């Protein structure tokens, strides 16, 4: 497939944009990806737009049942799509590109409800508006098709991780630490699979916001001042989600701040609770990998959690010498770019009619072409 550049030059490879805003709700990442049909060639640029505090509060409010939810969700979808369009425009400008240079834009949207047990997952984005604002063919609503085929609708990234990061000689694990942590297991000679291991940054961020009025614990500075509370850690690890077989997925519906508070007596040191939450994330990841990929010796990490040295130290301590920890940067993809790049890749799969569904990870009955497309 060829496309025209702003200078009218015909190119044989294609450019895609992926836009992702995750459960941390900190902002929107956009990544520029070059493809040759369904073949990945590389990521070439990135832009990030932080969420204004007001927008973030509105999104968090929508996590809980309340009045006028339908109207609020539609208005927020429009506001988000304007922010996504701004992020895409900044990315194009930074790369000296025009909208006609882009074959398609893949947009995940902002998850506000994830209920696979009821067959739905809600990501806010006004996709026709986004196509109109960007003047780029837009693909979105990626999770619904997998859910319709009986899957969890999550995680969607194992197929992308498989396409980029598989090693033909040994099992690799890819760990994404966003608000929720998820793993992709890439065994040689067998289909990839994966699942949500539990909270990633979500509880740590929520605790930091509640007790220090900061968006997150930068560089793990607050957690580093605390000590692990063994009894609290044990109670958190006893949650039945962690003993459920995969495929499985989770979200704020299960692991919110009010859930954590049911395990507290109110007298705990705030630094100690935060330190315990870091170990909680690390231990649940370690337990999941030990159960699902006991032969894995390498784990590649992406997502915002990689910037937290306390969490990284906890992971290293939990795994010991059994598994070596690496950044996806060692596999030529910046750890902050991976998730957004995945949705550019899924848009390319849609354009080329390639199933992008990791049905072995989600539990869907068959591979599916994910998403719906909107012309501008």
Swiss-Prot record:
InterPro entries: Anhydro_N_Ac-Mur_kinase (IPR005338), ATPase_NBD (IPR043129)
KW rRNA-binding (keyword) present: no
Organism: Neisseria gonorrhoeae (strain NCCP11945)
BP GO annotations: 1,6-anhydro-N-acetyl-beta-muramic acid catabolic process; amino sugar metabolic process; peptidoglycan turnover
Keyword hit for Secreted: no
GO molecular function, a single term: kinase activity
Domain of life according to the entry: Bacteria
Protein name as it appears in the record: Anhydro-N-acetylmuramic acid kinase
Residues that, per the record, bind ATP: 22-29
Keywords: ATP-binding, Carbohydrate metabolism, Kinase, Nucleotide-binding, Transferase
Family the UniProt entry places it in: Belongs to the anhydro-N-acetylmuramic acid kinase family.
Pfam families registered for this protein in UniProt: AnmK
Signal peptide annotation: none
Pathway: Amino-sugar metabolism; 1,6-anhydro-N-acetylmuramate degradation; Cell wall biogenesis; peptidoglycan recycling
Reactions the enzyme catalyzes: 1,6-anhydro-N-acetyl-beta-muramate + ATP + H2O = N-acetyl-D-muramate 6-phosphate + ADP + H(+)
Functional description taken from the UniProt entry: Catalyzes the specific phosphorylation of 1,6-anhydro-N-acetylmuramic acid (anhMurNAc) with the simultaneous cleavage of the 1,6-anhydro ring, generating MurNAc-6-P. Is required for the utilization of anhMurNAc either imported from the medium or derived from its own cell wall murein, and thus plays a role in cell wall recycling.
E.C. numbers: 2.7.1.170
